[in-house]
């Protein structure tokens, strides 16, 4: 039940000509203080039309407004404030959640539509660092949120398995690498070689040329180059899979950049057919001067392709394969120009589906105020952070609940959840200063706090069993009402998170629910025998449903015991 819509309907019967119901709904506010009611309508916009002060309009509207849904209507200055019938709303909200369970909050505006989400996309032969966490977890959450809105979701891990860096890595391996040493710890050793290349190239410019030459060989199918590339890729994917399992992240496919190698010439042909290619200093470009951007480089002067060519080819392939209505690219803000160019080239080709494509940037994880960089070796490995978080969770369990069953599994859920939630509680465009201490806190605005609240609610339900199907629910006290109002917002919160591509909307919401429930738990005798006992237990159950589902949308698990 959307009680704001009910309020808007009642007001639309008064403002039959002045405002539409949607306009009224858009104006309705939620008062910050409970004494001003559950919803408020500001009358400022009507002053000119009525030729009266907003306060007088509010008073007249309050006198006309009558609905059994409201227990009280009052004019306070320029606002019409209403108080909803708590019995009616709590009964409707709780019955809806009890009936729908984990389906509660589902929206259907995405039904029969497809969204492609491109996220995570680590580079082969480089360690999976904390810097990869944001794209991975934001994309994973957006995938769950889109599914909750009815979309068919294609989650693509566009692995960075092609490009000039492989020429550099092959050069470094052939100069300084040792096969036996690399086999012992492939990712770390290959990463060391990559960093060494960037150090050595400062004093030896010829290394850059060697790197370019090896990448050209790789593009031409040179046997040795391809064999080394396949080895680097295989070892990297093994490590990535282990980390994705720890994070609980899954993808529809791992079609990386190399997948499109044999399709790029066809796309370049399409650009030629549309007369969009120009030669510039031996390279092929699409001129974007009219759009106020530098030219989009399609092929370098040495004949090598560039990632823009692959991204353009991939976009057309994905549209032809999946027929997407939306396509999200969860990639850092440093790629903004690239995406502007990329989308503009597709528009120049006349593809209308580009209107559904969107770059979803995010802030950096900083270390000592600086962006982490794989070239300079300033890297904190995600796997090490996850392992430390899980170990800390184990220690907490041993101290607080040593007899807990499935300690290892719960520690994994809580430790990984702490890292994921820390990332997603921040608005995605905000930078995050890396701090292991803050990330692993198990109190305050953290994942473990929400998980513990869920476990606490589950423990109450284990003490009592109720046949909710036969109940009518009525909750009048302020603490229960605060929780009910929050639970009622869940579908709307999910829609907002989807429209904004913003998982932090969900994070903030589950924190609010957890905090409100804990106040309820501390002030209401839930298990005390009374006519409201079944209603109170129904509210506890509804909280477990919403917290578990809210955490799932973030990619965080909800243990029933901690």
UniProtKB/Swiss-Prot annotation:
- Source domain of life is Bacteria
Q: What is its main location?
A: cytoplasm
Annotated keywords:
Aminoacyl-tRNA synthetase, ATP-binding, Cytoplasm, Ligase, Nucleotide-binding, Protein biosynthesis
Cysteine pairs forming cystine bridges in this chain are none
Query: Single Gene Ontology BP term?
Result: arginyl-tRNA aminoacylation
Leader sequence range is none
One GO cellular component term, please give it.
Answer: cytoplasm
Where would you find this protein in the cell?
A: Cytoplasm
Q: What is its EC number?
A: 6.1.1.19
**Intervals of motif 'HIGH' region:** 122-132
Q: Is Zinc-finger found in the keyword set? A: no
* Reactions performed catalytically: tRNA(Arg) + L-arginine + ATP = L-arginyl-tRNA(Arg) + AMP + diphosphate
Task: State one Pfam family annotation.
Answer: Arg_tRNA_synt_N
One annotated GO molecular function: arginine-tRNA ligase activity
Q: Any keyword Acyltransferase?
A: no
Describe the protein's quaternary organization and the partners it interacts with. Answer: Monomer.
Q: Which family does it belong to?
A: Belongs to the class-I aminoacyl-tRNA synthetase family.
**HAMAP family per the UniProt record, alphabetical:** Arg_tRNA_synth (MF_00123)
Instruction: Enumerate the NCBIfam families for this protein.
Output: argS
Q: What is this protein called?
A: Arginine--tRNA ligase 2
The encoding gene: argS2
């Amino acid at each position: 039940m959307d009680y704001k819509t009910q309020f808007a309907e009642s007001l639309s019967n008064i403002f039959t000509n002045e405002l539409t119901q949607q306009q009224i709904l858009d104006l309705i506010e939620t008062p910050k203080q409970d004494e001003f009611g559950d919803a408020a309508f500001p009358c400022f916009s009507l002053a000119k039309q009525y030729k009266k002060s907003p306060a007088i309009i509010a008073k007249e509207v309050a006198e006309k407004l009558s609905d059994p849904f409201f227990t009280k209507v009052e004019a306070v200055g320029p606002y019409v404030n209403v108080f909803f019938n708590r019995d009616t709303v709590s009964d409707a909200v709780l019955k809806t959640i009890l009936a729908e369970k984990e389906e509660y909050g589902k929206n259907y505006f995405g039904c029969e539509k497809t969204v492609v989400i491109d996220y995570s996309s680590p580079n082969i032969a480089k360690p999976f660092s904390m810097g990869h966490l944001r794209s991975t977890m934001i994309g994973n959450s957006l995938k769950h949120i889109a599914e909750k809105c009815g979309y068919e979701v294609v989650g693509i891990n566009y692995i960075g398995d092609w490009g000039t860096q492989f020429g550099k890595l092959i050069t470094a391996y052939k100069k300084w690498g040792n096969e036996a040493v690399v086999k012992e710890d492939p990712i770390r050793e290959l990463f060391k070689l990559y960093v060494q290349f960037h150090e050595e190239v400062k004093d030896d410019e010829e290394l850059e040329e060697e790197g370019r030459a090896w990448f050209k060989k790789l593009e031409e199918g040179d046997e040795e180059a391809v064999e080394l590339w396949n080895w680097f890729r295989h070892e990297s994917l093994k490590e990535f899979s282990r980390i994705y399992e720890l994070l609980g992240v899954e993808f529809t496919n791992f079609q990386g950049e190399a997948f499109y190698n044999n399709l790029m010439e066809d796309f370049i042909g399409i650009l030629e057919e549309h007369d969009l290619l120009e030669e510039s200093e031996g390279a092929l470009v699409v001129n974007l001067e009219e759009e106020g951007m530098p030219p989009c480089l399609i092929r370098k002067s040495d004949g090598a392709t560039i990632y823009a060519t692959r991204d353009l080819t991939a976009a057309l392939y994905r549209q032809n394969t999946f027929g997407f209505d939306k396509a999200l690219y969860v990639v850092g803000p440093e790629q903004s120009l690239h995406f502007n160019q990329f989308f503009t080239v597709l528009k120049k080709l006349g593809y209308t589906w580009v209107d559904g494509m969107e770059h979803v940037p995010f802030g950096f994880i900083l270390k000592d105020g600086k962006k982490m960089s794989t070239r300079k070796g300033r890297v904190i490995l995600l796997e090490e952070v996850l392992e430390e978080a899980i170990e800390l969770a184990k220690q907490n369990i041993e101290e607080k609940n040593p007899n807990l069953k499935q300690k290892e599994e719960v520690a994994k859920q809580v430790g990984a959840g702490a890292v994921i939630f820390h990332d997603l509680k921040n608005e995605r465009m905000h930078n995050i200063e890396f701090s292991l201490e803050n990330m692993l806190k198990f109190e305050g605005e953290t994942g473990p706090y929400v998980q513990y609240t869920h476990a606490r609610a589950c423990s109450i339900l284990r003490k009592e069993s109720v046949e909710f199907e036969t109940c009518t629910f009525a909750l009048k006290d302020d603490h229960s009402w605060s929780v009910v109002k929050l639970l009622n917002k869940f579908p709307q919160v999910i829609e907002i998170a989807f429209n904004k591509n913003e998982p932090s909307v969900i994070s903030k919401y589950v924190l609010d629910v957890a905090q409100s429930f804990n106040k309820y738990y501390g002030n209401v005798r839930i298990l005390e025998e009374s006519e409201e006992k079944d209603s109170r237990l129904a509210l506890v159950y509804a909280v477990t449903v919403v917290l578990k589902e809210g955490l799932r949308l973030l990619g965080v698990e909800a243990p029933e015991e901690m």
